[in-house]
């Protein structure tokens, strides 16, 4: 699937980074919304009981979410999941698919398999002290949407076990 909007190049001089989100909806509804607007580069998760990966925007072009930061060299990945109200982590198959996608993003786009901060539970929107650290856009690696500066209303991707995902990626 390729979404026809946001076909603008990113700043290739910016540090390579990935941003993980949760859809807060299922596969079909999320894809339907993303085909109209706010498309990420990839969607990963369960589609009719099997894990799937869909690419909606080519890497190197601006994705539809995180508009204030889209000129950066970021790859946006939406995981099918609900992290706003519950302690969510991807199931094993989704975690493995995410790790495999991260390896491709590392090999093809240069995003290091790192997260810029130690593991912690920062709770819901606005409580993550890293939001104002100034690292996003200046440090390469993988970020959660909750790690990005402004607006202060994001919680995703929830309580992701970054170390576990990177361990899976290193075994790919």
Please tell me what each predicted stretch does.
Residues 48-56, 75, 106-112:
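Short C-terminal domain-edge/linker segments immediately following a structured domain
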Residues 1, 7-8, 84-172:
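Basic/polar, cationic surfaces and motifs that engage anionic cell-wall
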Residues 1-71:
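N-terminal catalytic cores of peptidoglycan-degrading enzymes
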């Amino acid at each position: 699937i390729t979404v026809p909007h946001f076909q603008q190049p990113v700043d290739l001089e910016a540090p390579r980074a990935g941003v993980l989100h949760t859809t807060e909806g299922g596969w079909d509804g999320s894809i339907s919304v993303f085909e109209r607007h706010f498309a990420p580069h990839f969607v990963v998760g369960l589609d009719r009981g099997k894990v799937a990966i869909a690419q909606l925007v080519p890497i190197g072009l601006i994705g539809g979410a995180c508009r204030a930061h889209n000129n950066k060299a970021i790859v946006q990945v939406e995981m099918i999941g609900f992290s706003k109200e519950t302690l969510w982590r991807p199931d094993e198959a989704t975690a493995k698919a995410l790790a495999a996608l991260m390896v491709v993003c590392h090999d093809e786009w240069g995003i290091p398999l790192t997260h810029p901060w130690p593991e912690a539970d920062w709770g819901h929107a606005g409580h993550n002290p890293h939001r104002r650290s100034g690292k996003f856009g200046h440090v390469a690696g993988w970020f959660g949407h909750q790690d990005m500066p402004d607006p202060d209303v994001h919680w995703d991707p929830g309580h992701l076990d970054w170390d576990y995902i990177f361990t899976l990626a290193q075994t790919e």
